[in-house]
Amino acid sequence: MAFVLSLLMALVLVSYGPGGSLGCYLSQRLMLDARENLRLLDRMNRLSPHSCLQDRKDFGLPQEMVEGDQLQEAQAFCVLYEMLQQSFNLFHTERSSAAWNTTLLEQLCTGLQQQLEDLDTCRGPVMGEKDSELGKMDPIVTVKKYFQGIHFYLKEKEYSDCAWEIVRVEMMRALSSSTSLQERLRKMGGDLNSP
């Protein structure tokens, strides 16, 4: 009986220790996946951005939100998750498939999905019962509006090659910012279960 209690205590300590939290540690793998996704987006370039200058648009990336220090840990996690989810949704469409090299697009979608799955292990413990409440908060709404603007732009431009190129460049900016946000979360302790 003493052995079982010792084992249970060890498991509890490991789950709340610096390397534990039952899988909610923002790993280096998550950062590597993020960098690989940026590399894939760069490789997806089919047109010179200079040839699409007439189609440029400021989508209003909420930079201060993803790069500033104004968000608390749970909010930052929600913003990161929403940015990755919306990026995945943007590239995981029929219209997107018609615009890009299929192999690179599949690799990008797989990479984004992997990041989301890695974050999903933390979503429940970090969000708990606050999930529905946080889903309505201003930063999440801002991210959703940002991506709605991108979808509207593509539709307005009839999903032209230049429109997709402008969006590709914009998504490189957005995912680069989300990588900065991931790094900030990691520096906050990395352990998303910690109070």
From Swiss-Prot:
Changing I166T: 20-fold reduction in receptor binding activity, greatly reduces antiviral and almost abolishes antiproliferative activity. Residues 1-23 form the signal peptide. InterPro entries: 4_helix_cytokine-like_core (IPR009079), Interferon_alpha/beta/delta (IPR000471). GO terms for biological process: defense response to virus; female pregnancy. Constitutively and exclusively expressed in the mononuclear cells of the extraembryonic trophectoderm. Glycans are attached at N101. SMART domains: IFabd (SM00076). Pfam families: Interferon. GO terms for molecular function: cytokine activity; cytokine receptor binding; hormone activity. Keywords: Antiviral defense, Cytokine, Disulfide bond, Glycoprotein, Hormone, Pregnancy, Secreted, Signal. It is found in: Secreted. PANTHER family: INTERFERON OMEGA-1, TYPE I INTERFERON. Belongs to the alpha/beta interferon family. IFN-alphaII subfamily. Paracrine hormone primarily responsible for maternal recognition of pregnancy. Interacts with endometrial receptors, probably type I interferon receptors, and blocks estrogen receptor expression, preventing the estrogen-induced increase in oxytocin receptor expression in the endometrium. This results in the suppression of the pulsatile endometrial release of the luteolytic hormone prostaglandin F2-alpha, hindering the regression of the corpus luteum (luteolysis) and therefore a return to ovarian cyclicity. This is Interferon tau-11.
